[in-house]
Amino acid sequence: SDEVNLKKAYVGVTNVLESNPNAYIWAGRDFHQRPQQGINDYFWMNHDGQGAGVKNFDIGGVQFDVAAVSQVKSCSPEVMADETNPSRITCTGSSDTGDNGHYALTTKTHNIKAGPIDVEVYANYGFDSKAVDSDARLEAWQGGLVLSHTNDSGVNKVILRYSDNSDNSVYNKTDDLTTVYASFEGSHKFTQQAQVEYLLAFHDYDNG
């Protein structure tokens, strides 16, 4: 099959919907829904792939992101015994042009204020197509909540995530797996030259 060495290739437009001019409509391959923490370098959600969606769709000041994406098919290079092949490798290790049968519907609700607290809510659903063997197909659910507070000295943030049949991505499914992730992180600036960052995290797996 063909291979493509592009991690990102997409188009996006605004000012398409008269009632929602700031809504950003996109389609293609992108680093999708991958919120990352700094100290532990952890993507607590990750749905990179190809698909389409809309971001910043405004309803009464609250903004919504919705997308349907698929996980990109990739190849792990292996040396072949067939010496008639000049390169003697199965592939270059880049991504395929198609998907591997794992799909996700992702949502994010943001620009919510609860007093001084900024609120973000995530809800994702994962499923498989016929490209996956029927006895291996699974569904997965995932919900997330982010509460953050910013002031002149820094920011504090609480992240909560619950996943059913998955961990940080509903692409990658494991039957009867339940995971919970919770963290508290932030930063405090003492002076222009001195700042401290901190993070406390809890990650629980229940594969029962």
Please tell me what each predicted stretch does.
Residues 1-80, 102-113, 118-120:
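Outer membrane beta-barrel
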